[in-house]
């Protein structure tokens, strides 16, 4: 059981690695944000759909040339702000639909929603690595565990511009060597924020506590307030929705709907706290992968061996708090097929912080290239 749970969390078995590195790429190829030039899927050369390996190799070759260009330095009038990336385990659009939470108020508070974001994997470790390496194009699963150019690391790019890196988890990070992978493959070297004194109502299947996310976020906000107006970039991984979690005192796996409801409520409450704090914060909510609450023709519900669309089609939202001219109305929807490089591109456009003090913001220009996809070939998707 323990080996299977580790497989589910990390994708550590050879068969799963092959699926990450090959099968899903056939669906995903051609839909990655083009680096350095915007967030839309670029025009792709024709490929023989009867030769999937050739198409796949062609895709990886294109991806090698895609990067986000961060500035070498910030202008003198740059405005400091906090970047908070909330990485949620086990949440896809299909899961929200299954438990009727797609219209939770949390999502209507977003300024930008990626409606067609692809997590590119069905496991936590690879998803976190891909997010931390968001400033370069996609790699095969195997290459995630190989050295990569330093410019690929999103948080390193921010650190070079004066952002202090911070790390939060609502778990220990020990199981499946998750924290170790963040350090070694994601180059996240910031010390883990203390969890001392934080309550927990959930435990993971192996009995480890899963700490209260609202309490952790409130502690984070308190620390930012005490730290003044410096620039920070925080990676926060949360796992209350992971399968096998239990309420304290129970030996039964907790139902998904109440856990999702509580997580969304807590994030919603935290955004209200941020608004009242007066801090300038860019909040990015980006799930690792889905929970597979709904099965498909490829596999039954609860299984994530095949990274099908029900698992990799995840809700990604961005909220800018503390703006002089905040976004009005419904979230700006980005329907273009996109992934992590699109997030890196948007962060690079926000990095000087001037958007917070401008009397008006051209949201269309801010997301230019993320809203109108150029033509790309049809790809093979599981049906």
Language model feature labels by segment:
Residues 106, 154-157, 262, 266-274:
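Catalytic-core regions built around general acid/base machinery
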Residues 351, 355-383:
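Phosphate/adenylate-binding glycine loop and adjacent helical scaffold
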Residues 245-267:
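Active-site-proximal segments of metal-dependent phosphoesterases and phosphodiesterases across multiple
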Residues 7-19, 23-29, 36, 46-232, ...:
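Active-site-proximal alpha/beta segments of enzymes that process anionic O-linked groups
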Residues 280, 286-324:
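Histidine-centered active-site microenvironments of extracellular/periplasmic hydrolases
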Residues 140-145, 204-206, 253-260, 271-272, ...:
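Active-site rim elements
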Residues 267, 284-285:
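Pol beta-like nucleotidyltransferase catalytic core
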């Amino acid at each position: 059981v323990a080996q299977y749970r580790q497989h589910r969390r990390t994708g550590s078995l050879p068969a799963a690695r092959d699926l990450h590195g090959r099968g899903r790429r056939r669906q995903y190829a051609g839909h990655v944000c083009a680096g350095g030039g915007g967030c839309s899927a670029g025009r792709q050369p024709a490929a023989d759909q009867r030769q999937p390996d050739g198409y796949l190799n062609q895709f990886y070759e294109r991806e090698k040339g895609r990067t986000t260009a961060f500035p070498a330095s910030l202008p003198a009038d740059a405005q400091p702000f906090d970047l908070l990336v909330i990485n949620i385990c086990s949440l896809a659009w299909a899961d929200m639909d299954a438990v009727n939470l797609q219209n939770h108020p949390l999502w209507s508070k977003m300024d930008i929603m990626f409606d067609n974001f692809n997590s590119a994997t069905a496991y936590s470790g690879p998803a976190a690595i891909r997010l931390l390496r968001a400033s370069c194009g996609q790699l095969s699963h195997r290459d995630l565990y190989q050295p990569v150019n330093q410019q690929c690391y999103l948080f390193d790019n921010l650190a070079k511009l004066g952002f202090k890196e911070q790390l939060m988890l609502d778990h220990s990070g020990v199981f499946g060597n998750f924290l170790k992978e963040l350090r070694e493959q994601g180059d996240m070297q910031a010390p883990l924020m203390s969890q001392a004194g934080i309550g927990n109502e959930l435990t993971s299947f192996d009995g480890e506590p899963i700490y209260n996310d609202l309490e952790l976020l409130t502690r984070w906000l308190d620390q930012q307030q005490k730290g003044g107006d410096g620039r920070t970039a925080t990676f926060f991984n949360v796992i209350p929705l992971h399968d096998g979690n239990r309420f304290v005192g129970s030996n039964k796996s907790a139902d998904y709907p109440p856990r999702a409801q509580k997580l969304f409520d807590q994030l919603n409450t935290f955004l209200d706290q941020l608004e009242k704090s007066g801090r300038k914060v860019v909040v990015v909510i980006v799930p690792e992968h889905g929970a597979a609450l709904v099965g498909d023709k490829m596999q039954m519900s609860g299984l994530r061996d095949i990274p099908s669309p029900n698992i990799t089609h995840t809700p990604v939202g961005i909220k800018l708090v503390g703006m002089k001219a905040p976004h009005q109305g419904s979230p700006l929807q980005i329907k273009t097929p996109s992934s992590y490089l699109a997030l890196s591109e948007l962060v690079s456009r926000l990095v000087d912080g001037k958007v917070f003090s401008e009397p008006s913001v051209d949201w269309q220009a801010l997301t230019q290239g993320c809203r109108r996809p150029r033509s790309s070939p049809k790809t093979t998707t599981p049906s």
